Every structure is written in structure tokens, then in C-alpha cells.
Amino acid sequence: VDRRQRQMCIRDSCDFKDKSLKRLAKQMAHVMYKNAGCGLAAPQVGVLKRMVVIDCDQEDGQRNPIVMLNPVIVAREGDPVEEEEGCLSIPGISVPIARPPFARCRYYDLDGQLWEIEGDGLLGRCLQHETDHLDGVTMFERCEPTARLKALQEYEVALAAGARPGETSVEG
């Protein structure tokens, strides 16, 4: 895993006056959709900013990305449920991770307006997974030690078979 992904982003690292954030959001959404993802955090593309793009409702073919600046999980509810998770930065594998099924997240949009989003199932899991990236936590740190060892071995096999983690970078 790229060492940049294990770095924590500063809590309020996105300045709403920064015009480059709109361009970055568009690039991140492009990378996410190109790689069939439902979420992408800025550290995954080499940018240490607290910024996430998610779209967990693509079944109807419509793209409705939500750009989240300085997101913070403000609530997690329910007994942890173990489900397989994948990650665009660690292609070719999935890992069983136990998370509470419900999450509520507070964030700002690109115009600096404060929002809250909440969800369970895929959305709740995605909110938690992507904000983990902002805190320097990958799915390897979230899984049980035996699952971690198995996942690392599978990742080596995936890399040997052609999986390329660097394909999530955005062009400057």
C-alpha cells in the first residue's frame, strides 16, 4: 500500500475558496467511475486533503456523485456486521471487515454549505471506509489478523496477475 495512504489528513484541510477543489472533485469522480467504484478519498489519488467523492446509488445508470469536504463521522449505530470490502487502491482483493451498519456524516459541499448524510448498508459502509482513508487507515488495519495475512497474500497474487494500484492517480 502506498505510504501516502497511511498519512492522516489535517482535520479541516479543505479551504472552500480553493478553486482547484472543483477540478479535483471532477477528476476524482472520473477515476471512481472508470474503476467501477462507489467512493474515493483524496489520499487515494495522492492528495492529502480531507475530501471524498461517493456515489452508492448507480443502479439506475445515473451518476450522482456527492463531493464531501472535511467530512466527519458523527454517529455509528448498530452491532458490527462483517461484509467483504474492496478498495480501488488495493485492487484485485476483498477483505471481510466488521463495521456498524449505520453511519451519519457531517460535511461541507464545494460551496461551503454544511450538510449531513446518513445511511446504512452500502452507504453506511462507504462513508466509514472513505473517511478511514482520510485518517490514514486502510482496510488492512480494519480486518482481523488472520484475514489480513490472507489478504496480503492475495494482494501479492493480484499484483503478479496485473492489478495496478497506481491507476487511481489523477493527472496534475
Predicted stretch roles:
Residues 126-135:
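Active-site His/Glu-centered metal-binding helix of metallohydrolases
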Residues 1-10:
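Single conserved hydrophobic/aromatic residue that forms the stacking wall/gate
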Residues 91, 124, 137-172:
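Post-HEXXH active-site segment of zinc metalloproteases
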Residues 32, 73, 129:
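Divalent metal-coordination and catalytic microenvironments
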Residues 50-91:
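Helix-adjacent hinge/juxtasegments
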Residues 27-48, 53-57:
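Charged, well-structured alpha/beta interaction segments
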Residues 109-125:
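Short pre-active-site segment immediately N-terminal to the catalytic Zn-binding motif
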Residues 11-19:
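Acyl-group handling in specialized metabolite and lipid biosynthesis
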